């Protein structure tokens, strides 16, 4: 019998950053040129991250579920989709592609509240939109209920706008 000894040699290619750092350690390096190379590398990383963000956002939009109008506005007798319908339609896709949503109150007065929604991606890219909404003082709501009603309404509309969502019956242009 012949005994065969196997060895595995793996070629490890240096990353761009490792090559730049090794060059920086050379005593005859042109620091201005090195800075320009680092700037170019940073620009390329940002471009790739933006591409990944747009690619994942496009995939998320294809993963949306239908939004059903599940409630009736007692004042206008019209149907609408509640906030939970919007969230249910997008949450699985957002989780799959590691997106996160954030809301924050940017400004509040006795009459209005400004809300911002941000969609964040692991690449560091974000998109945001905001709106100013009148505090809903209709009916017999106390001030906390009025604000809560307005925030729910604002979150639904901003989520729809940011993620290009529409309930089935709202989408009248196909």
Residues of each region from the PLM?
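Polyanion-binding surfaces on beta-sheet-dominated domains and ring/shell assemblies
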Residues: 1-174
């Amino acid at each position: 019998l012949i005994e065969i000894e196997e060895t595995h040699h793996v070629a490890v290619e240096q990353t761009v950053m490792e090559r730049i750092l090794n060059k920086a350690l050379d005593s005859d390096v042109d620091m201005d040129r090195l800075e320009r190379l680092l700037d170019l590398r940073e620009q390329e990383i940002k471009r790739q991250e933006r591409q990944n963000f747009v690619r994942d956002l496009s995939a998320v939009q294809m993963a949306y579920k239908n939004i059903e109008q599940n409630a009736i506005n007692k004042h206008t007798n019209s149907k609408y989709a509640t906030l939970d319908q919007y969230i249910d339609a997008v949450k699985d896709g957002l989780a799959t592609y590691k997106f996160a949503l954030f809301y924050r109150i940017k400004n509040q007065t006795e009459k209005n509240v400004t809300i911002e929604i941000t969609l964040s991606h692991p690449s560091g890219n974000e998109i945001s939109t905001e709106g100013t909404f009148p505090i809903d003082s209709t009916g017999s709501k106390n001030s906390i209920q009025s604000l809560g009603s307005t925030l729910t309404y604002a979150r639904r509309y901003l989520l729809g706008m940011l993620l290009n969502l529409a309930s089935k019956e709202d989408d009248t242009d196909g």
